[in-house]
């Protein structure tokens, strides 16, 4: 179940990252692929990978989004 949630979050965030023009978010797209694949290879439990994904992708994307909204 956690793996399914992780995959859904990953898909949604990759879609948003690559299609919504949030200035630096285009560069984050490659960054997230590297982070996720490295941690999938190193960490075997889906829960750890999910929390790493939240920390290193969802949180920075949320902060970028907040910054972009404050600039408008």
From Swiss-Prot:
Belongs to the papillomaviridae E5 protein family. It comes from the Viruses. It comes from Human papillomavirus 39. Keywords: Early protein. This is Probable protein E5. The gene is E5. Pfam families: Papilloma_E5. InterPro entries: Papilloma_E5_alpha.
